[in-house]
């Protein structure tokens, strides 16, 4: 006792917290020094001490103990400010989505981390005895991360795909979460709870499978006599590798003598302790060969020396020890442990932050610019990258600071920039590389439109048939707005003139800027083609009359005044835009409601309707029946007005009435169409009052008689107001049933009717009939609605052979029910303007057509719009066979003789337009003072350029006349395009009406203009501000809502005219005028003298290496993938990946890259080894090499996962398992011997022995079995049956008459025998002669094995050339 006291006095007193790792070390040192019994006694005392102290403290935890860190408020505010700036950068296209996500995550992660670091000192200063503080740093359950969620902030969470949600949870659990935060955190938290349970069971099952594989492996011999070994060499590096080197060596047995120079420092079969390892490290001995379970020659057990020391007591393992089961549990148990440890952070994300270099003081920074080159940081900021050490000087007033910036760092400031003290000037690349994985992030288009990019994208796709383009450098991708029009499946449109159609079948004509008089086959081929790629047929209207004749399917709206607001109505996809004028001019203009109809090609036949006017006097808001009364109708012309292709066909005839007495009648009634299932609260033929409830949520608007009619799928309920008469015998009102009666016609009735009435006789079932007398609304059709009030006077005069007539249409037939849709009005009469002209001569082959187009003339600063109507003759080809030709799908040969197919862009070479008569007539905007009328009529004979008009203050008009070459003409007219009258020369090659300019982008001109007939990649605009893309495979329509008008102040315009060019892209908030920045981003498509038209566009930034999907000019729909970024993401290092990863490796699933690599390696080895050794050895050696290589690779992979978690498992446990996975080979079919059948699985050692015994080649190849398969391919069928598939295994064993020698543990447990381990082991050892003669056998084999070893395993040069280094180096982790 005194001795002990004296020793204790000499001991050093350590006042330091001891954690789990330190405790492990202490216990292992105690065991080394004092042995097991004494150590357990000491540990008991430690346990007692701990429990006693814990009971004395008696900590309780209350909600008031959770104190939030005071600095949280400004930290969160600061992070939000940074996020807002980042959002703006993203919006303006300075950073792309990945950079934004990355930076956002780092901002919030840094905030969260800073809060977590603040938490500890805050508690220590304010409340050191706070229970939360004591618990969280006690090392027991609960750690800083969990406490941080209670009192700091929860931070960023993962979504179900494992991606980061860049909306952080700013609250902590003490403050409580908002609804959004709760929803975001639900997934992570639930995942934590569920995963803990699931992974625990997974780890348990993994343990079970592992034990199943190796349960029969017991130490049964002292030495198997192997001379193989695994080479381990200490690396030159220190730190990690040295630690792993020590762990690998301790407890192993040497396979060879180790020499230092000529002196032997360790002998074969000597076990290695810490002292010997240190000598190896200091002496830098050459590779040391150790024995391992891989090298053991025994088939179904293991020898003492190959296993090495036991981990429990530090001596060589005892005979009879069940090392297999220990190995299985050693690997399986940490899985359980790790699982439990992982998810208690509730799915909260963790990341890493780079180190920063800050300026020591205020001053000007200077560095050598030649040593750096510009780059982008991973957050998208501009920076300089330095490859070598960079010396930076910061000059303040009185002192010069020198800062050294390490290589591969980012410099975030420019040369000669003024920096403030503590400003971040550089970012240092993190020294340790974390686990990273490459992730793809797709960016999707959020609008419809057309893809556009600059020259920075490779226009040729990466693969020959793909549409994937690579970006060589950072650039913007633009999506130009516009609503695409999908083509129909029907190759030929079956619609007639003015039909209303669904959008799906709307055909958009492709406009070609090609000279149609050239008989070019390629032109004809392009005009009409099947678009097979998209699985639908696009219909391209060609120059042929028949095809174009069938293509009148859409009414194009006209925008007649640039500053007018557009009110667009879509009625059954017929685009009709009524005009809204400036308020002060409204009184003078024609009444609103006139709509001008121009067919899709702008071609009017005779008797075409040019405009129509809906008079508000003939408008009803209720349903009813139209009646023509007893008036004689001269002629009724029917036009089929509506065709729908949805299995039903409805015809709404248009009736053109020319009547002697211009009067018709409307019988109002209230109609409700109800579903068949609805419950009706009124009876048929009953009389109800106003506001009576009909169904649960519908009330009647009028009172009267109710008629209920039940149809197949619906119920029709009509309420007709009026009087009910039960006629007596004297009354003759019943005779007039079903007709209109004028006032005073009915006699002998009690009441006289002052207005027209409609009599209806109703006979209910089994009841007396009665008569309903209904009031009638009478409409007089005003005979001469004076259209001169709508149009200027000269428009109606017959001039130049063109006539306009006014015609009234009644839109509903006699007796037809008119159904009003809820809250919409019904137009009963439409006044139309019909265009007509005299045919030249009766039998003319050429039929005349009227071409309409729009011209714009500026008079006295008012923009005037003209409709221009030209008569053009066109050849008719075989009118009789019209339908056949259309059905055959052939374009006749004379199809390209017709010149002026396209009214908006005609290139007339054979016929000049001046041969035809034409008028340009004004339509609106008559000046208040009536000035400028002299310009109103222009014929094409005086279509030379008209200079600036009187009173016009713009003089920068382009003066050049248009050249013959269209390319030059385009460039010439691209100045400020505000040519005032904008009626250009009709030269023989180029004819333009306003807004039809071809737009060029400087990027778009191809290198070789071989396709001469097609002007390269341009846009064509018609007068409706619709833009046609000349790609034969796509249709796009721009509605006016996709355009943005930008008015420039005139004085400023002259200075900036150089900046703005047609086709240029403007980003958002770029200043182009005095009024302020341009708010929207887009492409300039029209340049006027004082205004621009910008086609709206969204732009996306893409950096180098990104993949662009789709082709240039391709139509994109919402949600299409635009671009894919590939970026590196640090992998979360927890066992989320760990446990499944371990399982994946052990089950040898091919998802992982390991099996792929192994296959490639094996092929390489086979080739090389055949060269070295010749054919006979090929199979034997390549199988051996494959097995050795894959074993080491598997061990390293499993160790990597566990080490990343700080879990240490001795290599020999993993080796024991891996040995079983790789212990089988597959017999090949070629060179097959008589012993085994092809594709049979046999043990590797057994194959070698039988091969030697028979002196015959058995060809086999290495195979990796998963742990499950290995468990089902053992020597014991009882063990297999008790694991899985019991019936199948037992049935097979019975059929094959298998014998179970009961060598393993499990089969003995199942049958209740003695287990062959521990004390029961001795009964199973049979000392055979083979065992006694081991030393002799070694001598015989030694010569050959030595040579083999030199060739295969340890020869440095050879191994270096064909085997990766980790083949002979377990130290590479």
Swiss-Prot record:
EC number, as in UniProt: 2.7.7.6
Main location per the UniProt record: plastid
Cofactor(s) the protein needs: Zn(2+)
Subcellular location per the Swiss-Prot or TrEMBL entry: Plastid, Chloroplast
Residues reported to bind Zn(2+): 224, 296, 303, 306
Gene Ontology molecular function, alphabetical: DNA binding; DNA-directed RNA polymerase activity; zinc ion binding
GO biological process, one term: DNA-templated transcription
InterPro entries, sorted: DNA-dir_RpoC2_beta_pp, RNA_pol_beta''_euk, RNA_pol_Rpb1_3_sf, RNA_pol_Rpb1_4, RNA_pol_Rpb1_5, Rpb1_funnel_sf
Assembly mode: In plastids the minimal PEP RNA polymerase catalytic core is composed of four subunits: alpha, beta, beta', and beta''. When a (nuclear-encoded) sigma factor is associated with the core the holoenzyme is formed, which can initiate transcription.
Function: DNA-dependent RNA polymerase catalyzes the transcription of DNA into RNA using the four ribonucleoside triphosphates as substrates.
Name the record gives this protein: DNA-directed RNA polymerase subunit beta''
Assigned keywords, A-Z: Chloroplast, DNA-directed RNA polymerase, Metal-binding, Nucleotidyltransferase, Plastid, Transcription, Transferase, Zinc
Cellular component aspect of the GO annotation: chloroplast; DNA-directed RNA polymerase complex; mitochondrion
PANTHER family reported in the protein's UniProt record: DNA-DIRECTED RNA POLYMERASE SUBUNIT BETA
Pfam families (UniProt xref): RNA_pol_Rpb1_4, RNA_pol_Rpb1_5
Transcription recorded as keyword: yes
Enzyme class: transferase
